Amino acid sequence: MIAIIDYGVGNLFSLASSLKSLGLETKVTRDAAAIRAADHIILPGVGAFADAMAKLEATGLVPVIKQEVEHKPLLGICLGMQLLFEISYEYGEHTGLGLIPGEVCPLADDLKDPSLKVPHIGWNRLDIVPGRENDPLFKYTKPGEYVYYVHSFYAKNCAANTLAASEYSIPVTGAVKNGLVYGTQFHPEKSGDTGLRMLRAFAEL
């Protein structure tokens, strides 16, 4: 069973629907016992980092998540991926879950092409880091496939844990990994067949 953590941030319907379309047992929950019973965990999220982190802490699930990722796979999606990092500079300075080394910073501050818009919205090519092609998350993914992004902040100073990136005048971190903890800045559930294949690969970890 895949537990989708519901902590009041974002619409979880499309993610749950995508997983169910693959025939995967899914449960949207904020119950610690259900998360402990799950085989896999997904941490979704849209919106502001500080608000999301506060809501996640209010559920009491932070210690549960940190315990469970020691022996089962977790996938953070979009803001959920950003929460995995140590710190975010989104309208201030905020502490994250600290499951992946690195920081989350404003995309607009680093873009080399001022004509590019922020948020970064739409399809972009996912370039897998050389040597990472055989990661289990990419079991059904070919280098250069396109995925769907919607974000204004991005993870940086995390090269050792980066699996893939997309070009947006700078390399934008697209997927990360630390042990059993995975994250995608893009939305697999909005990335068509490519995203579905990646979700299937995650479910097989």
Task: Label each PLM-derived region with a short phrase.
Residues 34-35, 68, 175:
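Structural alpha-helical scaffold elements that stabilize or flank donor/cofactor-binding regions
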Residues 26-28, 104:
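Generic structural signal for residues in well-ordered beta-strands
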Residues 103-205:
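Amide-donor transfer/coupling interface in amidating biosynthetic enzymes
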Residues 2-24, 189-190:
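N-terminal beta1-alpha1 ligand-phosphate binding loop
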Residues 49-121:
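Cysteine-nucleophile active-site neighborhood
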Residues 42-44:
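Structural motif
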Residues 38:
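An anion/phosphate-binding loop that grips the pyrophosphate of nucleotide cofactors and donors
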